[in-house]
Design a protein with these regions (language model features):
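Catalytic cores of RNA-modifying enzymes
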Residues: 1-198
Length: 200
């Protein structure tokens, strides 16, 4: 989200509670920043790890959440090998995702779809609408097709500008993506991706 900080704790709690659709398994939060979402994930008594690239945020998290000490990963999520994170165990992906890389985060999710049965979090409203769009919709596109091939997408709720400091120029939205029953598309996945990108 850049330098727009979520200040409404009720919204943060609501976002954190979206992980409850996949109970018991570990949680990976991407881009925790100052921990506004993290503080509501920790009481769930699950194995919570956070990935943060910004040095100052990492230092703050270590100070504010000592119980997270060994579970703070200072790294670029887009370059990580997610297979090793929880010893090959499936996990929930969540976060107030940085809007400038949210699409890349979801492409990364698709690479590890067999490890990620559930992905929730907050993104730009326009992107959320695209991901959740049905065939024939004006917003139906590459993200819609690729994600919906493997996940059932639910647009949960809209988050308005005034709950951030400073308020961004765009609305946000919270979505939930649950892995569907598809295990094989019946064609080469790379070819499928290329065809979809060419089509749109």
């Amino acid at each position: 989200l850049g330098q727009h900080f979520l200040k409404d704790l009720k919204v943060a709690q609501d976002i954190a509670d979206t992980v409850d659709v996949c109970p018991e398994i570990p949680i990976l939060e991407v881009g925790p920043g100052m921990g506004v979402l993290t503080q509501f994930l920790l009481p769930k008594e699950r194995n919570v790890k956070v990935v943060e690239l910004d040095y100052e945020s990492v230092a703050y998290l270590r100070e504010a959440y000592p119980q997270l000490e060994d579970n703070i990963i200072e790294d670029d999520f887009l370059k990580m090998n997610l297979q090793r994170l929880f010893g090959g165990q499936a996990f929930v992906l969540t976060g107030n995702y940085p809007y400038n890389i949210s699409s890349q985060i979801f492409f990364k999710m698709l690479e590890y779809k067999d490890l990620i049965p559930c992905c929730t979090g907050m993104i730009q409203k326009e992107v959320a609408e695209r991901i959740a769009a049905g065939p024939g919709s004006k917003t139906y596109g590459i993200l819609s097709v690729l994600i919906q091939a493997w996940y059932k997408v639910e647009y949960l709720f809209t988050v308005h500008e005034h709950v951030f400091n400073p308020p961004p120029k765009v609305k946000s939205a919270v979505i939930c993506m649950m892995r569907n029953e598809t295990h094989n598309l019946g064609c080469d996945e790379k070819l499928f991706k290329q065809v979809v990108k060419t089509t749109f």
